[in-house]
Amino acid sequence: MRKIIHVDMDCFFAAVEMRDNPALRDIPIAIGGSRERRGVISTANYPARKFGVRSAMPTGMALKLCPHLTLLPGRFDAYKEASNHIREIFSRYTSRIEPLSLDEAYLDVTDSVHCHGSATLIAQEIRQTIFNELQLTASAGVAPVKFLAKIASDMNKPNGQFVITPAEVPAFLQTLPLAKIPGVGKVSAAKLEAMGLRTCGDVQKCDLVILLKRFGKFGRILWERSQGIDERDVNSERLRKSVGVERTMAEDIHHWSECEAIIERLYPELERRLAKVKPDLLIARQGVKLKFDDFQQTTQEHVWPRLNKADLIATARKTWDERRGGRGVRLVGLHVTLLDPQMERQLVLGL
């Protein structure tokens, strides 16, 4: 049985700012773009979250909720330096590390001899070491598979951890809401609830064939997760090549104005996700995806050096006009392709 730890730093960007400037510790702060430039919030500290300020929220809305919010532009070199230090701490316990972004990672400690081989004690020690060396707090989840470790890391935030032992998995899954499973969004959750499926326990009683007919490939993933099955390895060679966000509509859309409104809502989340893996927002390409009512889909990309909403909207409009052919649209997606590390190095050297 594997021992997987998911470590997730607590409001990472904001925590670095509070550490380096103690005057910020007890006031609401957020990292994000200015209201004048229609920026979005990347992360907010816990005092700001009490006012409802959240990641991916437009800055203007955040300032309405919390007029005395201190807005910071971000110091991404400082965040990258802290992230590298955290990753070095991970490497003291295992070489099997899969970073997901600057502030979270999976660790496979199945074969680790540290702390007498106890994943629970390793997670505690890692969190304490991060605090001792960086004065930052982390939360952790421990479980026999990746998706449960990720869910567990959110159970006792901030500055806590939650353990799901192999023996506890069946009982934990029985009452686990399907919306907690990574990949189950609001639309999917609503469709599942309409089928009478609210928890993993409900899905365990459902015929796999029904899920496959209703959700396709995702139906199998959902069924497996509800059984506690997740065979994905912690991949230390993992190199993220793209970042995306998409929305499946409850009803097909037929007007460009509807599509544009969805893009406006998706863009802040794309920006937030990209900032977690690429704080400078430099990219190789960006593009859009449309899926039609006949389940055919099309994508269109442009070479573009930095995330740009106006270009994404223009690309989507061109795709809508040229490829829709009168069909309804059931899914809208935005994505970026990241720079190859070698190409990025050449760009930096050329500056």
UniProtKB/Swiss-Prot annotation:
Any one Gene Ontology biological process term? SOS response
Which chemical reaction does it catalyze?
A: DNA(n) + a 2'-deoxyribonucleoside 5'-triphosphate = DNA(n+1) + diphosphate
Q: Identify the residue position(s) of the site Substrate discrimination.
A: F13
Q: Name one GO molecular function term.
A: damaged DNA binding
Which cofactor is recorded for it? Mg(2+)
Q: Specify which residues bind Mg(2+) according to the UniProt entry for this protein.
A: D8, D103
CDD domains from the xrefs? PolY_Pol_IV_kappa
EC number(s) recorded for this UniProt protein: 2.7.7.7
Note whether Zinc occurs among the keywords.
no
Keyword tags: Cytoplasm, DNA damage, DNA repair, DNA replication, DNA-binding, DNA-directed DNA polymerase, Magnesium, Metal-binding, Mutator protein, Nucleotidyltransferase, Transferase
Q: Name one Pfam family in it.
A: IMS_HHH_1
Active-site residues, as the UniProt record annotates them: E104
The enzyme's first-digit EC class, named in words, is transferase
**Which InterPro entries does UniProt cross-reference here?**
DNA/RNA_pol_sf (IPR043502), DNA_pol_Y-fam_lit_finger_sf (IPR036775), DNA_pol_Y-fam_little_finger (IPR017961), DNA_polymerase-Y (IPR050116), DNApol_IV (IPR022880), IMS_HHH_1 (IPR053848), Rev_trsase/Diguanyl_cyclase (IPR043128), UmuC (IPR001126)
Q: Is Heme there in the keyword field?
A: no
GO cellular component labels? cytosol
Cofactor binding notes: Binds 2 magnesium ions per subunit.
Its localization reads: Cytoplasm
Domain UmuC, which positions?
4-185
Q: How does it assemble?
A: Monomer.
Q: What job does this protein perform?
A: Poorly processive, error-prone DNA polymerase involved in untargeted mutagenesis. Copies undamaged DNA at stalled replication forks, which arise in vivo from mismatched or misaligned primer ends. These misaligned primers can be extended by PolIV. Exhibits no 3'-5' exonuclease (proofreading) activity. May be involved in translesional synthesis, in conjunction with the beta clamp from PolIII.
**Protein name as annotated:** DNA polymerase IV
